[in-house]
Each structure stands twice: as C-alpha cells, then as structure tokens.
Amino acid sequence: MYTKDTIVAVATPQGNGGIGIVRISGSDALSIAEKLTKKRLKPRYATFCNIYNINEIIDHGIVIFFNSPNSYTGEDVVEIQAHGNPFILNLIIKATLEYGARMANAGEFTERAFLNNKLDLTQAEAVADIINASSETAAKSAAKSLQGDFSKEINNLLEKLIYLRMYVEASIDFPEEEINFLEDQKIHNSLQDIYKTILDVKNSCKQGAILVEGITLILVGKPNAGKSSLLNALAGKESAIVTSIAGTTRDIVKEHIQINGVPMHIIDTAGLRSSDDIIESEGIKRAIKKIQEADQILFVTDDYTNSQVKFSDIKDIIPEFYHQIPKDIDITYVHNKIDLLKEVPLNHDNHIYISAESNIGIDKLKDHILAKVGYTTQNESIYTARERHVTAIDNAFDHIKLAKEQLELGNGELLAEELLIVQEHLNSITGEFSSDDLLGEIFSSFCIGK
C-alpha cells in the first residue's frame, strides 16, 4: 500500500568512503532538509552547507533538492552528500527521523518511482539488475532495459494485439454484417506477425535471463578424472587442489567466472564412487544434492583403452548414482587428458575433447556451453530479463498458438478469449496489471537506498 509519508536511507554502499549519500523522499523532504541545513534550498542547485542536529554540527557537505514531479521518485527528493563515514551518516539519519521521516524499506524509492509512473516494472527491475550486474555485458543489457528497450518491445506487441482484438470482437458484436471478418487475410497476417514477434521476444528474454541469473555448471565424474583441473582451466586460476590421489576433492568447490560476458557458477564435486571414508561419503552426498540445481552437467571422463576413447554412457560409468541425476538436465561428456591419445577425435554431439592440464580444447568447451543454453554473442539487442518475464512470455506464446488454432477453426469468441489472455500475460511484464504481493516481492529484493 502506497503511503505518502517521508522516507530516508543511505543510498551508498556500507563501509567507509570519500562520499556517503543520504536520500530523503516525500512531502516533508524539503522542510526536513532545511531544518538539517538551516538553509533555504533551491530546486536543482547544489548547496554547500553545514548539516546540523538541532544546533550541533554533524558534518558539512553538498545538498541537492529535486522538486516533485521532476525527481527519481516523482516526489520531493533531497540528497545529502556527506563524508562517507557510517557513524556520520547514521547521525544524519537519526536527525532526519527525529524530524518526522521514517526508514525506507528495501527498494521503496524505486517502488515509489514505479507507482508515480516514473518507471514501468521492467525498468524498475533493471535498476536492481544494473546495480547487481556481474559482467560488462550484463551491465550494458541492464542499461538497455532501464532506458526502456524491453518495455518498447512489449508495448509495441500490446498495441498490435489490442488492435487485433478490436477487429475480432467487432466481428462478434456485429453478426448481421455479411462480411466474415474471420476470413479476412488481414487478421491472419496480423496474428502471424504477433506470433513471430512473441517468439523473437521469447528468445531474447531467455538470453537476457541468462545474463541476470547466470548458468550453473556441475563438474561430475569418477575420482581423478580431472574435474579439479578443468575447474582451474575454466576459471583461469588455481581454485581447486589438483593431485594424482583419487578423492582429493571431498567437498563442494565453487567458482564464479564469465564466459563472453555470461556469469557462470561452476561447482566442482567429489568424485562419485562408493566409499567407506566418512568425509568423502559426505562430499559425495553433497555432490548429488548440487546436481539437482544444475543447468548443465559436465561429465568429466578419462575412460580410454589402448589410447582409444571409450564411448561409455554415464549410466555405465557411475551406475550406482545415475538414477539420482535428473533426466531433464543436459549432460556434456568432457573427455579429458587427450594429450595421452595418438589421435584426437573430432568434437561431436555432446562429446568434447580437452586437456585441462595443457589447456587444449577449453575455448571449444566454453562455446559449447553457451550454445547449449541458446546464448549467442552476435545478438547486440539483448536486454536483461527475470524468470517471471520468461514465464509470462512462455505463457503468452502458448496462448497465441491456441489463438491461431481457434482462427483456423473459425471460433471467433474463443479466439478473442485467447487474445485477451495473451494481453494479460504481456501486461504483467510491464506492471500494467500486477498484484500487491508481486510488487512487494520484486521491490524487497532491492538494496535499502534504492
């Protein structure tokens, strides 16, 4: 529920720094700031002044007043740029609270910007994405969403969809007309155009979601197959201990890297085998649990006979664990230690040949990983997307397919109903129709000062 009281929070990261910013927003923001500074503040002017708690000077700094509606939140906003010492910033916050403000909830400044139509929901989410971006590519894509690229795509779709709905519903409302609107080629062409556009947005959304969420890779295999060496090769540094002793990795080893700007969460697991060692057995249990969370499994093997590759299936190599691996997770067989072979086979299907120790084939493996999730570096128009966006687009796509079926069958009323459902799913992306629960969940994931 939107309350128009005045909120305050520190807008800069925790810890010491050269500058710390306290942000105030609400109807009393200006009067509180003028009490703190004992100055008359002009809109959009940087005023250098002392900051007081009644008559005691807390600090001095620059204060800027942004009057409504020309501010980030759409309300009166004041930003106090003081020295970046947490104790000083807390004193300023304390004085602000005494003058009638309250502490802001997580994401409340951006929530107010959304509720005051300064941002739509995809742009509001992009604020968090640009702050939390873990790669340059993710940051650039979040900036595209923030400037409205994603919203424009959805709004253009909605405009076409609403026009088509009007046309279809007109044919239902005026049955006395001799013209059969449903046989009009314009409807077929328009519906096909919407179908194709939703499919394009669906593909872009999935790539954008990868930039936000990243890809979780699990390294699985028998002991001493070279999983830890592969982790180090992918990470470009020594993250895991590598020895010739089987079972060296007894716990989960995690590494966060980027491949062509895509965040990768790589998890090296204990070698899968039956073991009487209590510690190793616990590591294997944790490995099995982590496998359930994977986007991809890299099954590392060095299964060679007489310098020839053995194309054994995962269920043959680790039969006692195979039934615990989810069937819907993609598995890539990474044949390690190819430097031991006289002749190296060509990569094919889900079989990639590498030498983690010699760094042979690592770039090919990286390309394979990205290709498996449908990510392409050639797409310069990717904007960041959330899992909820992907779900909404998937639902919209399912119902636009049903709409096409109803058009072919000549069922005007069912066609109109399917188009309405598509519209509702698209509206949920930009926040045209969103429940309070959904908004609360989205904005609670923000940092306090945003």
From Swiss-Prot:
Localization annotation: Cytoplasm
Cofactor remark: Binds 1 potassium ion per subunit.
EC number: 3.6.-.-
Protein residues bound to GTP: 224-229, 243-249, 268-271
Record-level GO cellular component terms: cytosol
Binding site for Mg(2+): S228, T249
Keyword Transferase: no
Cross-referenced PROSITE patterns: G_TRME (PS51709)
Record flagged with keyword Cytoplasm: yes
Xref: Pfam families: MMR_HSR1, MnmE_helical, TrmE_N
Domain TrmE-type G per the UniProt entry, residue ranges: 214-374
CDD domains (UniProt xref): trmE, TrmE_N
Record's keyword terms, sorted: Cytoplasm, GTP-binding, Hydrolase, Magnesium, Metal-binding, Nucleotide-binding, Potassium, tRNA processing
Domain of life according to the entry: Bacteria
Gene Ontology MF terms: GTP binding; GTPase activity; metal ion binding
Residues noted as binding K(+) in the record, renumbered to the chain: N224, T243, I245, T248
Cofactor: K(+)
Family, similarity comment: Belongs to the TRAFAC class TrmE-Era-EngA-EngB-Septin-like GTPase superfamily. TrmE GTPase family.
Its biological purpose: Exhibits a very high intrinsic GTPase hydrolysis rate. Involved in the addition of a carboxymethylaminomethyl (cmnm) group at the wobble position (U34) of certain tRNAs, forming tRNA-cmnm(5)s(2)U34.
Protein name: tRNA modification GTPase MnmE
Gene behind the chain: mnmE
